[in-house]
Amino acid sequence: MNILKKMRGLLSLFSLTKGRTVGDLLLLFPLTIMAQDDVISCLEVYNLKTNTHTVVREFDYKIEAPNWSPDGKWFVYNSGGRLFKLPTENPSAEPIEIDTGSAKGCNNDHVISSDGKWIGLSDKWPSKVFVVPFEGGEPREVTPDGPSYLHGISPDGSEVAYCAFRGDKRAVCTKRLDDSPERCLTDADGLNDGPEYSPDGRHIWFNSSRTGEMHVWRMNVDGTEQTQMTFHDSLYSWFPHVSPNGKWVVYICYSKGDLKADEHLPNKNVELRLMTSKGKKDRQLVELFGGQGTINVNSWAPDSKAFAFVSYRLKR
C-alpha cells in the first residue's frame, strides 16, 4: 500500500511539473528552492515623504515577504517554513515565532486581515490556504484544493483571493471562509497571480502574462473589466500592493532579458516602482538585489506613508 501511494504521489508530481517553467516550479515548490539560497537578508522601510529607504534589521539567513500589521506594531515575515513577528518600534528585538500549529511549511504568501485578528497563509505541498489567529493557534483549511497561493484578504474579512493551479489553468480565484465553492475570475492563458483587494473592496489587482509579457492588471471584484495597468517595454511587472488609503500601488519589476515572463526568481537585479491607483505618475523608487521574497505580499504601513521590503546580499 505504501509503495502504491508513493507511486501515485510521484505520478501526481510528474503531472504537475511536466512542461512547467522555472517560474512555475518556484510557485509549486518555493521552500525547497529558496532554502538553497545562501544570503544575508535586509529588512528595509521605504519612506514616501523623504523618498529614502532604511535597513531596519539584517538577518544572517533568508527571510521573505514582510507584512506590516494594521495596528502598526509588527512586521511579520516567513523564514524556514515558520512565521515570525518583529516590533516595528524595536526591530533589533528577538523575533517572536507565531504559533501556526500544524502548518510548519509556510511559504512567502501570507496576509494579515484588516482588523488584525488573523493571518491567512499558504502552507507546504500542495500549498493550500489556511487561516490562523494572529496570536497563534491551529490552522483552519480554506481551500480544499491545491496548489493555492494566497495573496489577498477582502476588507471585510469574508473571503480570500489566491493564485490557483487548476488543470492547465493558472488563475485568480476567490473563496469565502465558509464552505462556499471557489470562484475563478480569470480564464486567460498564462500565469495570473498576486491577487489583492483594494481597500474599498471594489477591485482586485493582480499580475498576468496573458499578453506574453508580465504586467499589472486590475479588475472588478466580480471579475469583470479586466484592465491592463502597466505597459513597460523593458520590464516585467509583478505583485501590485495597494496602500491602505487607496491612493498608491507599489510593485516589483524584473528586466525582460533576465528571465521569462512568468518567472519571478530570486537573486536578480530588480526595481520597486510606484503609481497611483489610476495607473498614473508611474516612477521608479529603488533598485535592489532580490526578487522572489522581496515584496510578495502587501507590506504597507497603516498610514500609507511607508512600506517594508527585503533586499539581499550573497554571502561570500
Can you say where each PLM-predicted feature lies in the sequence?
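Multi-bladed beta-propeller domains
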Residues: 43-62, 86-106, 132-147, 175-191, ...
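Conserved beta-strand position repeated across blades of beta-propeller domains
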Residues: 67, 111, 152-154, 196, ...
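Blade-level signature of beta-propeller repeat domains, shared across WD40, Kelch, NHL, RCC1
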Residues: 291-316
